[in-house]
């Protein structure tokens, strides 16, 4: 995601779409001029890792047509055909997440650091976001919908759009159109029911692409996805996969953090047989807050452990036939590049002690009773012994 465009915060879709800011952004992008809010994408691309803009444009066959129809001043007569809606409502407090993306982290932030986030849900703005998508569907302008969070299956906006899509799909003039709208999700798969109805039954009619946000399996999953239960999630995976994979579109989006990489053999034991599309992510420190940094970062481990686990993970993916594996390999290789560039920082003993203290402090607020060091003891004895001696 880009950084916030503060001057356009909570403007209407019409105001935003052809604002002076967005017109200039389009002109700059076509000219190859860097956009200051897009630093994250540029960082990824320099490391040979797919950025959000790369993945988004890959699935848009109309992109060249849209660019060709752009006016000289950067304005567009056509309205958006791609909607990316991210709710903040969530039931997990994932270790790799933060208060920008999860409502549970807003409460955690206050509890851990006595920082009172003045965030208030703007229900009218949320409702209008859903109306914008519905109006685009009515006009047959929308070609792609991305739902993320938070947890999208907890979002009333999401379900209002799904209900409308279903109603449109029953009409002859919309049946084929709705069928061809590409809908994809980033979901933690903790929810299987909405208002006493099975979610798979409610969304089956458009066969979305599920990008399951699941970090590892068993103890690794339950630590990384703090608040999650592996038995429930693995059961939901089975159910969603059996209903929503008619076009081999089911996928997984794991954050490649240290426990996930160290526990990669169990990851393969569970997921490989399903042949999921890979949408795995780099581990990043959210919103640049140093106090959020933890030993989820594999680059913090000493060279001999880092090389062993990262190269083993690269080897597992290289030898697999999983679709999308090349970007996952690129992510793992980007860790090697970054660590080599900052080796003195990652091996600084005071720095490591500070990060360990932050990790231990975060562990005091876990919803589960298994701390980071206890997970390490299960998945990698050598890493556990080194960590305990910091």
Question: Which residue stretches match the model-derived regions?
Answer:
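A general structural signal for short secondary-structure junctions and capping/turn motifs
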Residues: 29-32, 73-75, 136-137, 174-176, ...
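Core AdoMet radical
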Residues: 77-89, 98-128, 140-158, 169-195, ...
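Distinct, well-ordered alpha-helical segments
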Residues: 159-163, 194-201, 263-267
């Amino acid at each position: 995601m880009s950084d916030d465009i503060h001057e356009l915060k909570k403007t209407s879709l019409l105001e935003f779409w052809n604002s002076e800011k967005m017109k200039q952004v389009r002109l700059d992008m076509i000219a190859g001029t860097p956009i200051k809010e897009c630093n994250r994408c540029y960082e990824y691309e320099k490391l040979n890792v797919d950025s959000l803009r790369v993945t988004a444009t890959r699935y848009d066959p109309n992109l060249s047509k849209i660019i060709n129809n752009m006016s000289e001043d950067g304005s567009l007569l056509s309205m958006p055909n791609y909607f990316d809606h991210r709710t903040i409502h969530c039931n997990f407090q994932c270790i790799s997440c933060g208060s920008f993306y999860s409502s549970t982290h807003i409460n955690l932030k206050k509890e851990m650091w006595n920082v009172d986030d003045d965030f208030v849900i703007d229900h009218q703005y949320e409702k209008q976001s859903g109306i914008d998508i519905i109006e685009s569907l009515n006009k047959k302008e929308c070609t792609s919908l991305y739902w993320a969070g938070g947890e999208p299956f907890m979002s009333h906006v999401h379900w209002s759009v799904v209900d409308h899509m279903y109603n449109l799909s029953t009409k002859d003039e919309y049946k084929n159109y709705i069928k061809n709208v590409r809908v994809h999700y980033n979901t933690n798969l903790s929810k299987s029911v909405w208002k006493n109805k099975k979610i798979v039954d409610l969304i089956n009619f458009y066969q979305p692409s599920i990008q399951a946000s699941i970090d590892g399996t068993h103890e690794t999953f339950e630590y990384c996805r703090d608040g999650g239960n592996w038995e429930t999630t693995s059961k939901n995976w089975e159910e969603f996969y059996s209903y929503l994979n008619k076009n081999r579109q089911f996928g997984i989006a794991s954050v490649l953090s240290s426990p996930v990489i160290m526990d990669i053999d169990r990851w393969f034991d569970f997921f490989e047989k399903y042949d999921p599309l890979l949408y795995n992510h780099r581990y990043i420190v959210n919103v640049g807050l140093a106090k959020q940094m933890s030993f989820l970062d594999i680059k913090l481990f000493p060279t001999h452990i880092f090389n062993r686990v990262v190269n083993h993970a690269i080897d597992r993916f290289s030898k697999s036939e999983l679709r999308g594996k090349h970007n996952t390999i690129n992510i793992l290789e980007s860790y090697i590049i970054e660590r080599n560039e900052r080796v003195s920082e990652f091996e600084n003993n005071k720095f490591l002690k500070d990060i360990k203290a932050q990790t231990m402090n975060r562990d005091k607020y876990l919803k589960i009773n298994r701390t980071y060091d206890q997970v390490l003891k299960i998945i990698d004895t050598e890493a556990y012994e080194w960590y305990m001696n910091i």
